[in-house]
Swiss-Prot record:
Molecular function GO terms recorded: 2 iron, 2 sulfur cluster binding; electron transfer activity; metal ion binding
Pfam families for the chain: Fer2
Domain 2Fe-2S ferredoxin-type positions: 4-96
UniProt keywords, alphabetically: 2Fe-2S, Electron transport, Iron, Iron-sulfur, Metal-binding, Transport
Organism phylogeny: Bacteria, Bacillati, Cyanobacteriota, Cyanophyceae, Synechococcales
Species annotation: Synechococcus elongatus (strain ATCC 33912 / PCC 7942 / FACHB-805)
Keyword Chloroplast carried by entry: no
Annotated binding of [2Fe-2S] cluster, by residue: 42, 47, 50, 80
Assembly and interaction partners: Forms a complex with heterodimeric ferredoxin-thioredoxin reductase (FTR) and thioredoxin.
Note on how the cofactor is bound: Binds 1 [2Fe-2S] cluster.
Membership in a protein family: Belongs to the 2Fe2S plant-type ferredoxin family.
Record's protein name: Ferredoxin-1
GO BP terms, alphabetized: electron transport chain
Keyword Metal-binding: yes
General function of this protein: Ferredoxins are iron-sulfur proteins that transfer electrons in a wide variety of metabolic reactions.
Length: 99
């Protein structure tokens, strides 16, 4: 099992934190375990409440069903169903930017 450094950033929220996340753990779940309060609703990859944007690195979010190909290509990620596949930096609280 690999573990990656996941950096969660959001200037408006005063968030700039790096956590260790195993490659079989959803980023949202790992953040919660570390006491980081990120937005979420369905926890199933079927809405956009937890949306973030990948700044660098890669994730596996094959369990998601909400984002379209263009949104994924633009770097959007649903943190509730995203596993890290490398060290990754994600801007959080990006739901409004999807629309």
């Amino acid at each position: 099992m690999a573990t990656y450094k996941v950096t969660l950033v959001n200037a408006a929220e005063g968030l700039n934190t790096t956590i260790d996340v195993a490659d079989d753990t959803y980023i949202l779940d790992a953040a919660e375990e570390q006491g980081i309060d990120l937005p979420y609703s369905c926890r199933a990859g079927a809405c956009s409440t937890c949306a973030g944007k990948v700044v660098s690195g890669t994730v596996d979010q094959s369990d998601q069903s909400f984002l379209d190909d263009d949104q994924i290509a633009a770097g959007f990620v649903l943190t509730c169903v995203a596993y890290p596949t490398s060290d990754v930096t994600i801007e959080t609280h990006k739901e409004e930017d999807l629309y």
